[in-house]
Amino acid sequence: MKHKIKHIHFVGIGGSGMGGIAEVLINQGFQISGSDLNGNSTTKRLQCLGAVIHHTHAAENIQSADAVVISTAIQPDNPEVIAARERRIPVVPRAMMLAELLRLHQGIAIAGTHGKTTTTSLVASILAEAGQDPTFVIGGRLKTVDSHARLGKGEFIVVEADESDASFLYLQPVLTVVTNIDADHMSTYEHDFNRLKQTFVEFIEHLPFYGMAVLCADDPHVSAIIPMVSKQVTTYGITSENAQIRATDIRHDQCKMHFCAHIGVNGSARTLDITLNLPGKHNVLNALAAIAVGNELNIPDEAMVKALATFGGVDRRFQQYGEIRLPDRRSFTLIDDYGHHPAEIAATMAAARNAFPGRRLVLVFQPHRYSRTRDLFEDFVRVLSSADALLLTEIYSAGEEPIIAADSKSLVRAIRVQGKIEPIYIEHINELKSAVHTVVQEGDVVLIMGAGSIGKIAPGLAEPTMKLTLITG
């Protein structure tokens, strides 16, 4: 039956989770087409690989398709979805298509509210360094291969497992990681945090009897579900003394981290001296998760150490543009990051302060979704108030309708009441560049954050100026 599927169409193919799957399928020999209203680097790359890309949503786009793949961002009234259902063309959720890829490999699925993309990239890099030639599908562009995805010849596939719509329950990996559990996408779980935790347990229980769950013992909510898990478990952490894989002697070195990784699993014990080419304690935890996976798969220590030391990074994950000089000779350090949850913002700001101690931190943030802003409003106010200067643009709706008192102006008012900083509200994102140039002082660190259209701002900030030095680690 499967051989009848030759042409697969993706609705919203430019999305990070969609483009990676499409690329793997192209490399497997499938004919791929897709639609996306806004072209981006993903659609351009797919076109170069042979995909047919449409920049409209229209019924005729799926004319010869044997299956249509959709993400949860695609609404039921999309004309391509309507046409597919009318013609009885299978409409396949993105996670179900990802599950098909896992069925053909030994699947490693990285789950958690934060850190999925970086951890997935670290695991893929460790396997590649060990000569395992893994397939991977990542939510960001891995710089070493200039892609979200790659079809390898080895037995392993490494993927992100998305809890935002509970679609990770489609996946049946042999090894899984849970980095943390935090309040996000709570409408999926009817605003019941216990239901969210229970869904993670259900995800872990999809492992086969010989499978392994790698769980972060430092995260209180992950620790809370460990007694509910019947599968084999390896724990990791920094502060948890009972973790089987621990980091000690952690040192910041500009945009790198040094630490000792103590591995005590199955009665054996050894220590690795690690240099991680990423900043921040949160990335030390991500590296420990990757080490735990490598240890379970018997990856040589030398390969793990080298992969972490030479890790090339992921687009928009503490992506450094170096020192930028303005025409009036003021210079500042520019960093771009995808983080959009208060916990992610706090961790990234801490990493920036440790990497560039004593320098003023200017945060430029675009909130993502009205519902997230409403649900985490007080956390946003607290975290955003800790910047030295704040530029806040209007919310990127991601298709949501506005919610009263859950917009950027409301955040600005609440932050102003705190009295710590005077936030600057920028209504139109195309005004951000000039606003940054106005606010920035000599020696500042400018941190751009958000998951929406703000991703286009950092390249524009760097373009017309003179790069002094590019800091790579």
Swiss-Prot record:
Keywords: ATP-binding, Cell cycle, Cell division, Cell shape, Cell wall biogenesis/degradation, Cytoplasm, Ligase, Nucleotide-binding, Peptidoglycan synthesis. Its main location: cytoplasm. It is an enzyme of class 6 (ligase). GO terms for molecular function: ATP binding; UDP-N-acetylmuramate-L-alanine ligase activity. Disulfide bonds: none annotated. It is found in: Cytoplasm. It catalyses: UDP-N-acetyl-alpha-D-muramate + L-alanine + ATP = UDP-N-acetyl-alpha-D-muramoyl-L-alanine + ADP + phosphate + H(+). Signal peptide: none annotated. InterPro entries: Mur-like_cat_sf (IPR036565), Mur_ligase_C (IPR004101), Mur_ligase_C_dom_sf (IPR036615), Mur_ligase_cen (IPR013221), Mur_ligase_N (IPR000713), MurCDEF_pg_biosynth (IPR050061), UDP-N-AcMur_Ala_ligase_MurC (IPR005758). It holds the Pfam family Mur_ligase_M. One of its GO terms (cellular component) is cytoplasm. Its EC number is 6.3.2.8. The keyword Cell cycle applies. ATP binds at G112, T113, H114, G115, K116, T117, T118. Pathway: Cell wall biogenesis; peptidoglycan biosynthesis. The keyword Cell division applies. One of its GO terms (biological process) is cell wall organization. Belongs to the MurCDEF family. Cell wall formation. This is UDP-N-acetylmuramate--L-alanine ligase. It comes from Nitrosomonas eutropha (strain DSM 101675 / C91 / Nm57). The gene is murC.
